[in-house]
Design a protein with these regions (language model features):
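N-terminal first-folded block
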Residues: 1-29
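Short, Lys/Arg-enriched anionic-surface-contact patches
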Residues: 28-41
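Flexible coil/turn residues that form the inter-helical turn or adjacent wing/linker of helix-turn-helix
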Residues: 53
Length: 96
């Protein structure tokens, strides 16, 4: 699967995102997404559709109803960067 991406691996054209794209991007990073992680990615996309922005981690944790600490345990590199990357969303800026 060949998709245009930024230097950090984010989709250049977010409209090319799909569940298949999400799983392929994760696979390329040697990440097997759990059901919980897929749900978080879908909720991040929902939040973005409603607010036209990527939420800060504290806001996102409340939005999905998961403790912030648990989010960090599920995503070893921190939650919002892989969630937005695999979700076809813009790369977060600032403190996430």
């Amino acid at each position: 699967m060949s998709l245009d991406r930024t230097g950090n691996g984010y989709l250049v054209d977010p409209t090319t995102w799909s569940l298949d794209v999400m799983h392929e991007m994760a696979k390329e990073d040697d990440v097997a997404l759990s059901e919980s992680q897929v749900m978080q990615i879908e909720k991040a996309r929902e939040y973005f559709d409603e607010n036209s922005s990527v939420p800060p981690i504290r806001t996102f944790a409340k939005y999905v109803g998961i403790d912030k600490g648990k989010l960090f345990k599920e995503w070893l590199t921190g939650p919002l960067k892989p969630i937005t990357k695999y979700g076809g969303l813009p790369q977060p800026t600032g403190c996430v």
